[in-house]
Amino acid sequence: MSMAVDMSSKQPTKDFFSSPALSLSLAGIFRNASSGSTNPEEDFLGRRVVDDEDRTVEMSSENSGPTRSRSEEDLEGEDHDDEEEEEEDGAAGNKGTNKRKRKKYHRHTTDQIRHMEALFKETPHPDEKQRQQLSKQLGLAPRQVKFWFQNRRTQIKAIQERHENSLLKAELEKLREENKAMRESFSKANSSCPNCGGGPDDLHLENSKLKAELDKLRAALGRTPYPLQASCSDDQEHRLGSLDFYTGVFALEKSRIAEISNRATLELQKMATSGEPMWLRSVETGREILNYDEYLKEFPQAQASSFPGRKTIEASRDAGIVFMDAHKLAQSFMDVGQWKETFACLISKAATVDVIRQGEGPSRIDGAIQLMFGEMQLLTPVVPTREVYFVRSCRQLSPEKWAIVDVSVSVEDSNTEKEASLLKCRKLPSGCIIEDTSNGHSKVTWVEHLDVSASTVQPLFRSLVNTGLAFGARHWVATLQLHCERLVFFMATNVPTKDSLGVTTLAGRKSVLKMAQRMTQSFYRAIAASSYHQWTKITTKTGQDMRVSSRKNLHDPGEPTGVIVCASSSLWLPVSPALLFDFFRDEARRHEWDALSNGAHVQSIANLSKGQDRGNSVAIQTVKSREKSIWVLQDSSTNSYESVVVYAPVDINTTQLVLAGHDPSNIQILPSGFSIIPDGVESRPLVITSTQDDRNSQGGSLLTLALQTLINPSPAAKLNMESVESVTNLVSVTLHNIKRSLQIEDC
């Protein structure tokens, strides 16, 4: 039995992105350094002991009491006892039966245990030099020290397993209670309508009336009666104004929709694999640009399908390696819930409007076609969202290659002017080619091709939107890579100590990461221009433009109940995105800008890595003042396109329970934070960067700050101007502090 302790739990965590091919050792996935050879030894029980200095450290949930190990004298005593027993056995016939001598054990003193416990907390796997030094200090043999640490690690593992088992039992009991409650509710629902209380006869009568009205509408429109199967959950609801027109898609034969999808798949493959002259590389930016004349020569039907009056075509292509196998990745695109979660910063609403055709194979995705809706957003309220309806299909091109194809379908013989007025964004054949590489990795080649109507965009973001960077392929690929990387770190069971400081259990690590992810997704919903919120533009006394929205929380247990106000402001800063991101992450500089700290210094309690980049991390920080201590949960994320820093004050007692592995779902969090995006200008002079060499090679940053405040715990309370001014003043003070700290007050 090996004494090396891992952090694997009794039951692996189930995740829809889990892949058997994924390596759950972060060191094995992300670090290519060659590991040194290990020299296995055997302890006094004949077990193998590996003294590998570059091993990961076990996580324990608690410390046990004093332990004891067997000394050299014990071992020598055991050998001596064996000899005496042999002599006694040889003389058994003459002297009768003799009692076997008891083996001696050596109990360490309290002082010895205290010193070894102190070293164990710092280094559970001491090297030879540390063991020698400790043995001399405590008057013990090196083997005694070695065996004590070995036994201590075994105890820690047993404690951890018992703790995780208790958590699993509690979760099982909770699921049983929920199942029982659902069965009872279903039995009640079968006897009466949950909304009006009517019986089954009333429901059948109402259903017949609705069917009759639907048949009349179909007869008037001359449509074939294809069923409309919407799959919109509460968090995926969307405005159906433009759907009044788009239901004309169902007048098309399904074979016609399949034909359009097949043609779009061929076009996507061509767009993804072609080089020059279809794609040309920009000398100024280094990005690929679509040669539209060459595109129309290759696909002449694209000109005929274009809407009149549309003058903006956005086309981009990018590729990258993601940490997920191709099949799992394809499945996530065909599940609207997983798709929305994967691209939470880009998609505010999503729904499957209808399933045109079921797929084949075990997972039923190969050949699947479905009509979908999505509302795309940027993390700022000043850029309008884009609503788009499209047909998505999934094709397995080869055993190792999949294609996810999106295309908006136009209805023949329809009023194109009405269509253009309702649908301001259309997808020309777009999507991604996913190719399995090895060890759970995939290469994703993304093509984003949009036909959008001209819209008014604030000058601050105009360059970013007009160049196609805002909703382009680079943004989608970078977001996908970050999400898959986070999942790998979340599922990992063998985590180095430096990647999980301050959290000693695997269950605690996962609970903290879950709480941080929920906080960040809540921030995404709060900051964008989605129709979830109604933003009002105001101008502060200092002349700063600001957007303000308010909402009432009645039922969400994850947020405080009452009236919540969000104030947001966007501005350009002559600072590189990387430097600005590091500034907000640094707890040593938090007191320079955060009004919550009130000038007090901040210390980090825990820091969990969730990606290869050191900036992708979750931290719990404490702000100590004379009156009280405040804990702040901070989630930092960065990729090649954008960076986000989200934070929120959290209750100390409940957060301590989360650190111990408790469920964080119902902990109230009201997040604020920053979104940092490159300004779209590849080279701008006089920009502050982290190094002097990069001063003229990087652009500035588009910073969006959003602060949320609970102004009244009563949902019935009315919003007043004093409360709004207090929030907007806080935003103004924070922005002023940021400029002063970065020495750019003139901007």
From Swiss-Prot:
Free-text disruption phenotype from the record: Defect in trichome development. Defect in accumulation of seed coat mucilage. Excessive root hair formation. High seed oil content phenotype.
Keyword set includes Transcription: yes
Other facts: The gain-of-function gl2-1D mutants (T-DNA tagging) exhibit reduced endogenous levels of anthocyanins.
Domain (START) ranges: 250-489
Function, as annotated: Transcription factor involved in the determination of epidermal cell identity. Required for correct morphological development and maturation of trichomes. Regulates the frequency of trichome initiation and determines trichome spacing. Acts as a negative factor for root hair development. Required for ectopic repression of root hair development in a subset of epidermal cells. May suppress hair formation in root epidermis by promoting differentiation into hairless epidermal cells.
Annotated coiled-coil segments of the chain: 155-223
Domain of life: Eukaryota
Pfam families found in the cross-reference section: Homeodomain, START
Assembly and interaction partners: Interacts with GIR1 and GIR2.
Keywords of this entry: Coiled coil, DNA-binding, Homeobox, Nucleus, Transcription, Transcription regulation
Segments of skewed composition (Polar residues): 58-68
InterPro entries recorded: GLABRA2/ANL2/PDF2/ATML1-like, HD, Homeobox_CS, Homeodomain-like_sf, START-like_dom_sf, START_lipid-bd_dom
GO MF annotation list: DNA binding; DNA-binding transcription factor activity, RNA polymerase II-specific; lipid binding
Family label: Belongs to the HD-ZIP homeobox family. Class IV subfamily.
Protein name: Homeobox-leucine zipper protein GLABRA 2
Region (Disordered): 31-112
Biased composition (Acidic residues): 73-90
SUPFAM superfamilies, per the entry: Bet v1-like (SSF55961), Homeodomain-like (SSF46689)
Compartments reported by the entry: Nucleus
